[in-house]
């Protein structure tokens, strides 16, 4: 019964798809609409032919299976074909996102009782450590070092004491000099006031060595002579004091010019008696043998 020759070979009819009369304009974007439309037209045309042949009693021709090459169900295909000369790498056209550094948000931390206790314990521990270190450092000084420190303190105290004494002496000396100047000015004013005022007569300067003619019973002459002797005495006394001070400064015996800072020398200078100034008082004789005897 030949099974192989009983089947009729179907005739394959080549079908050309109908071209649309409208000329399609090339689009700048990706081309996928025209391709999808052609596939739909081909599938509809083949279905109509198959239906007509089944009505006539003939089997439809074998169709080429596009399994693995095209999908069985027609769907829209997206072919990203760049029309311009651009970069074809997908990574360059769609670069990946850069790695971003995420910083933590500074939120206020809730202070709990445990944290407070930890802080207090840390503070107390640090304070106790510092106190222990101080206690350990105290007995580390040796006896020699203690003696040296004590000696340095005593020397510093003596130096301060000597400076205070020097300042006190300088102030006392300046005060004494001011008093002497005031006394000198006062005596000069006294001498100027004690001069007799002349009513158109010439004023005679009286020297202490001169012998003055006077009447023994004239009290005005006696007062005039006494006043002049006192004034001359004060002037001579002040002049001698100034000369003595200048001599002492020239010799370098005054304490503010000395460069020694030893306390023993200062005590010796204090105990040393001051030099006395001898002043002569020349008295004018009130009675003259030659003139008064006549």
From Swiss-Prot:
Compositional bias per record (Basic residues), positions renumbered to this chain: 1-12
Lipidation (N-myristoyl glycine): 2
Disordered: region residues: 1-28, 255-279
Compartmental location: Cell membrane; Cytoplasmic vesicle
Residue stretches of biased makeup (Basic and acidic residues): 268-279
Keywords, in A-Z order: Cell membrane, Cytoplasmic vesicle, Lipoprotein, Membrane, Myristate
Tissue: Expressed in proximal tubules of the kidney.
Membrane topology: Peripheral membrane protein
Compositionally biased residues, Polar residues: 17-28
Impact upon substituting residue 2 to A: Affects the subcellular localization. Detected in the nucleus
Gene Ontology terms: biological process: energy homeostasis
InterPro entries xref list: FAME
Any Pfam family the entry gives: DUF4619
Reported consequences of knocking out the gene: Deficient mice are viable without major developmental, morphological or behavioral defects. However, body weight and mean lean body mass are significantly altered in knockout mice. Mice display significant decrease in serum ferritin and high amount of albumin in the urine. Pregnant knockout females subjected to iron deficit diet, result in developing embryos with altered sizes of inner organs and interscapular brown adipose tissue.
Gene Ontology CC entries for this record: cytoplasmic vesicle; plasma membrane
Function in brief: May be involved in tuning the metabolism, energy expenditure, and excretion processes.
Protein name, as recorded: Factor associated with metabolism and energy
Protein species of origin: Mus musculus
Lineage start: Eukaryota, Metazoa, Chordata, Craniata, Vertebrata
């Amino acid at each position: 019964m030949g099974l192989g020759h009983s089947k009729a070979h179907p005739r394959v009819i080549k079908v050309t798809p109908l071209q649309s009369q409208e000329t399609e304009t090339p689009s700048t974007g990706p081309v996928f609409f025209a391709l999808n439309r052609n596939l739909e037209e081909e599938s509809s045309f083949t279905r109509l032919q198959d239906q007509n042949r089944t009505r006539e009693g003939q089997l439809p021709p074998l169709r080429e299976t596009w399994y693995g090459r095209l999908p069985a169900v027609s769907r829209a295909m997206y072919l990203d074909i760049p029309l311009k000369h651009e970069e074809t790498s997908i990574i360059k056209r769609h670069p990946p996102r850069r790695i971003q550094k995420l910083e933590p948000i500074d939120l206020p931390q809730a202070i709990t009782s445990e944290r407070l206790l930890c802080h207090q314990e840390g503070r107390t521990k640090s304070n106790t450590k510092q106190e222990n270190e101080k206690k350990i450092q105290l007995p580390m000084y040796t006896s020699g070092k203690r003696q040296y420190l004590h000696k340095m303190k005593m020397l510093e105290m003596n130096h301060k004491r000597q400076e205070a004494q020097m300042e006190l002496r300088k102030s006392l000396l300046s005060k004494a000099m001011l008093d002497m100047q005031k006394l000198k000015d006062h005596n000069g004013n006294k001498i100027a006031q004690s001069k007799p005022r002349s009513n158109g007569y010439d004023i005679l300067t009286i020297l202490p060595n001169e012998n003055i003619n006077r009447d023994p019973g004239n009290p005005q002459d006696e007062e005039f002579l006494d006043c002049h002797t006192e004034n001359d005495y004060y002037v001579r006394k002040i002049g001698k004091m100034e000369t003595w001070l200048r001599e002492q400064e020239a010799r370098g015996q005054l304490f503010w010019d000395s460069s020694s800072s030893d306390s023993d020398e200062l005590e010796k200078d204090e105990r040393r008696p001051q030099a006395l100034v001898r002043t002569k008082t020349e008295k004018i004789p009130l009675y003259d043998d030659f003139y008064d005897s006549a």
